[in-house]
Each structure stands twice: as C-alpha cells, then as structure tokens.
Amino acid sequence: STLMRSSAASDVYKRQFQSQESLNVYSYATDDYFAFLEDNSGSNFSRDKMCLGVGRFPIRTVTEATQMVDKTISYMENKDSGSWKNNVTFVADDGNNEDSFTTNHMKQADQLAEAIEEMQPGFLVNKVYFDAYKRSSLGTYPDVHNEIEKLLKSGQLLINYTGHGSTTHWADESVWTQTDINNSSYKHLPVWVTATCDFTRFDDLNTSAGEDVFLNKSSGGIALFT
C-alpha cells in the first residue's frame, strides 16, 4: 500500500493527479492514479484497476503528522473489543428541493444495510433515514442530528452517509457539520464512508469537514472512504 502525506492544497510539489478537463463540473483530483502500475494503464479510470491501496494523510504541519501517526498507532493497538465493533450506522438523505431524489439515497443506503444484515448477521445495523424523522419548522432535522451524535458516542465500527453534501456539512439541512466534527468527543473511532459531494475535498484551499474527521486528534474517525 502507499500513503500520501500532505493536503494537496498546500503541497508545493503537487503530489496529486488532476484530470485533463479544466471545467469545474468535469474536473477532479484523485490519488488512484498512483496505483495504476500495469503497462498502459491509467488512461481509463472506469476500466483500469488499482494494483495497491492508496491513502492520504491530509496534513499541513509536522505537529499534525505526529498527531495522526500517534492516532493511527493508538487505534491499531486498541485492545477494547467491546460491542462497539459490531455497530454500523447508515445515514440517508431525502434529497433536496431542486431534485427528485426523495427516496433514492435511502434506497441506496438500505441496499448496503440489508447486504450487511444478510452476509454478516453479527453486526447491529442502525438506520438513520431522514424521512423517518420529523422536520422542524425551520426545515431541519434536529432529531437526525441528535441520533447521529448519540450513535457516535455509543461507539460505531463504521458510519456510512449517502446523500447531498459539501465541504462543510451533510445535506442541505446540515444534519452533521464541520463544527460538530471539530467539537466531537467520543472514545471509539469509526471508519467513515461518505457517498456525497466535496465532503473530503483534500485539494481545497480550506480544510474540508472530511479532513477534520481524520485530523481530530482524539475523536472524529480513523479513516475515510469518500
């Protein structure tokens, strides 16, 4: 496996792959490129296969690097094999006013949740789907926020979010925000899987919410697939 060390936005040597397209809606940055090691691979991202795993520590300073290495070692050496390692949570958006994805994200999340329940019945699957909660007069879902907070504090092996997002929050209702992440305090660190936009945009000039999940030295999460 390969580990990229830096936030691409602050990397003088630009150790990242940028797509050829310059238009914002078509352009993207990815580290997958560095794992296409076979001859003539790397020109077709939808077809070519990575030859090894690639991860990135989105660090900007020596202090952050030290903290993240310590955090990783602490997680790997954690002997607490309590029930938290059997807990997984799926959070699903209900779309927004500008699209027709009223149930799409929930269906996608539920397919994954049901697959785990079928193939790994030992896991306790928690489902936090927006439509199952009451919307406030301000158009937000305070109970969704509270449930996410409660589940994270109780300990989760994995938390999965499917829906709209940005560099600072989940969903247009802002059910989980960068402020929540930075203020979080819980012992057991989950793996975060986020099927959303921009949440861990490591080449942004500002630190994204997903990066802060990892950079939180004592809470947040231990890794992200995003």
Where are these regions (language model features)?
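Cysteine-dependent hydrolase recognition
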Residues: S1, S6-T226
